[in-house]
């Protein structure tokens, strides 16, 4: 019997080298997971509509429409919460939070990933995830997590 392979939308900021490195680590782990279709991991940074001038209205419209369409086509959203971790800031990126909310509203499971272990978690995020992988060691478990069963995995983070 073959195992279903899930399509993933990867929600994450990708504006700095540190952010892009975290994305690559998470993608690498997901590609090792037997319940993930490694060819169906949608990474928004790879779909930026270069045919339109960056920041223009047409570019904004195309990127927003594409990202929202892909969130709703995904079986699961994996969200990297770290935004400005290198600067010691622990608030998630607003775009990532929007994508989490969109997925949750559409009943698409959200798997949260956070490299910064000591941060606190906003109540709205704390109630919207299916599983939470906290810290570099725990994040390694993404490669073995069963995205078909989607077992609830809680975090001990303080909730605000």
What residue spans do the PLM features occupy?
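Conserved catalytic or regulatory cores that recognize and/or transform ribose-phosphate-containing ligands
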Residues: 1-160
């Amino acid at each position: 019997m073959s195992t279903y392979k899930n399509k993933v939308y990867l929600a994450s900021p990708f504006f700095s080298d540190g952010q892009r490195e975290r994305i690559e680590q998470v993608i690498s782990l997901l590609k090792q997971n037997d319940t993930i279709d490694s060819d169906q991991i949608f990474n928004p940074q790879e779909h930026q509509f270069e045919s339109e001038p960056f920041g223009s209205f047409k570019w904004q419209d195309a990127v927003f429409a594409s990202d929202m369409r892909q969130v709703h086509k995904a079986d699961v959203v994996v969200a990297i919460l770290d935004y400005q971790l290198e600067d010691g800031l622990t608030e998630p990126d607003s775009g990532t939070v929007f994508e989490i909310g969109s997925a949750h509203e559409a009943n698409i499971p959200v798997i949260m990933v956070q490299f910064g272990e000591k941060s606190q978690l906003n109540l709205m995020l704390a109630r919207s995830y299916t599983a939470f992988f906290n810290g570099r060691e725990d994040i390694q478990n993404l490669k073995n997590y069963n995205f078909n069963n989607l077992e609830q995995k809680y975090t001990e983070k303080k909730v605000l």
